[in-house]
Every structure is written in C-alpha cells, then in structure tokens.
Regions:
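C-terminal long alpha-helix characteristic of the crotonase
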Residues: 26, 126-131, 182-232, 245, ...
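A general structural signal for well-ordered alpha-helical segments in protein cores
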Residues: 71, 149, 158-161, 193, ...
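An acidic, glycine-rich surface segment that forms the CoA-thioester-binding/catalytic face
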Residues: 37-41, 45, 71-111, 150
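Acidic, divalent-metal-coordinating active-site segment for phosphoryl/phosphodiester hydrolysis
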Residues: 113, 169-175
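CoA-thioester-processing core
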Residues: 92-98, 106, 112-165, 195-199
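Conserved CoA-thioester-binding segment of acyl-CoA-metabolizing enzymes
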Residues: 1-61
Length: 265
C-alpha cells in the first residue's frame, strides 16, 4: 500500500504496521541533494507521527546505498548554517531529540559519509556482503557532522572509530560487523532488505507498542542523560505499563496460549 505524501526522491510503502522508505536517486548513487534530504526528513516525520506505524525500514534503490552528500548542491545551505529539513519533517540523522519508533536499515554497495551516519542513527543495521563503507569527510577538508564523531566511538570503541574516521579509508562488511556498525551480514542486497523487513515485522507485529516505546525511551535517556536518570525512571515506567490494556492482553494471551493482540493502549 502506497502513502499519499508528495516525495520525489524517496519511495514510501506501508507494509502493515511497517513503513518502508527507499532512497530513490539510483542514477546518482543515491547522493543526497537538498530535495532528497527534505524528502527523507518528511518520511521520517510521517513515521513518527502516524500512530498506526510501529516501525520503519530504510532501504536504497539501485546498486548502492548512498554516495553521501551532493556537495555542490548542499554545501551552500550547510555552510550558511541553514536547516535543510522542512517543518513537517524530522532530522534523518536523529539528532533532534527522542524518537518513539524503531528503525531498521538495510545497506548494499557503496555507503559513504552520511550513509554511515544514517546507519548509526538506526536501531538495527543489516548489510549485504558486498557493501563498502568509508567516512571520507576529512579527505574533503571537513569532518563528519551527522553524528559519527559521537556515535561511532560509542558503538565501535575509540580505536576502531578513529581508525576509519581519521583516515577516510574504505572498509568492508566483515569489518563493519566486527566493530558493531552492523548487526548482521547477508548474502546480497535482496537478502539484506528481506532480513531488515523481517526484523521490523518482528517488532511491529509481535511486540507491544507501548513496551517498545518505553524500551527505546529508557535506552535513549541513558545515552543522553546518563544511567542514573534512566535508572530513576525504571520503576515509575513499569508501574505505568502495568496499568495499560496491552499489559493485560499480554498476560491474558499467555494464559490462553495464543498470540497477543496489542493495540498500543
């Protein structure tokens, strides 16, 4: 099922409770110009505000995930300190505050610069075995400004992150898996996309939406405000969840030995 949102460079497909978002400039290796940044921002905005959507999947059309920024088009906007994101969108690098919907990303081919940062902003990442990664900003006189300087050291460890951030060298899917940039490696692009969709549906179709949101919120709070702040919220949040219809349904479905039918209430 398609969705009525006027986007030119990003495709949208609703698959049950999952929104599949596809980078759609394959003729340019999915390099991000201003239009594509705005389109992906609006797609992420839709994912967050549509209560019927419980998870998102980010994929790319063509042979490559992304060649990074189209610097000739985007550089003037970035250099002027202007935001490329519309009012009804969200920051695709997820630097604009808490998010309530989990995101699974599938990558193939070349994944450069902001592509790596899109992966780091996702909750689960799957790659095809042919993928090649590089954070090449330092080779262009700038530096990664979409979160890699913060997230890659945190996720991969300082040495692993600096090995690639400071040199701009290319690395393969096996190395991406070793350092924790991706969680799974599949045979090819089709398998990566299928696995990402499978994981998203495991979340959207089986897990209670309120439980998923509370889990994300707790983990995000620990990262942004520290463990003590997250620990302080554990008991109050579980008390709140025990009072929901979904918690009652979780117990009842267990007693009746049937799949739970969660409503997000």
């Amino acid at each position: 099922m398609t969705i009525d949102l006027d986007l030119q460079t990003v495709t949208l497909e609703r698959d049950g409770h999952v929104l599949v978002m596809g980078l759609g400039r394959p003729e340019k290796r999915n390099a991000f110009d201003r239009a594509m940044l705005a389109d992906l921002s609006r797609a992420y905005g839709l994912l967050e505000r549509d209560d019927s959507l419980r998870a998102g999947v980010l994929v790319a059309h063509g042979d490559h995930f992304t060649a990074g920024l189209d610097l000739l088009d985007v550089a003037p906007t970035i250099a002027a300190g202007e935001s490329p994101f519309p009012a009804d969108g969200r920051d695709p690098w997820r630097l604009d505050g808490p998010w309530t919907k989990p995101l699974v990303a599938a990558v193939q081919g070349r994944c450069l610069t902001l592509g790596i940062e899109l992966l780091l902003a996702a909750d689960i990442r799957v790659t095809a075995a042919d993928a090649r990664f590089a954070q090449i900003e330092v080779l262009r006189g700038i530096y990664p400004f979409g979160g890699a300087t913060v997230r890659l050291p945190r996720d991969a460890g300082w040495g692993n992150a600096m090995r690639w951030l400071l040199t701009g060298d290319e690395f393969d899917a096996a190395e991406a898996h070793r350092i924790g940039l991706v969680q799974e490696v599949t045979d090819d692009a089709a398998a990566a996309r299928a696995r990402a969709l499978e994981l998203a549906h495991a979340i959207a179709d089986r897990s209670a939406p309120l439980g998923v949101q509370a889990t994300l919120a707790s983990a995000q709070l620990a990262r942004s405000a520290g463990e003590a702040a997250a620990f302080e919220r554990l008991q109050p949040e579980v008390v709140r969840l025990f009072g929901t219809q979904d918690a009652a349904e979780g117990v009842q479905s267990f007693v009746e030995r049937r799949p739970a039918r969660f409503q997000g209430r």
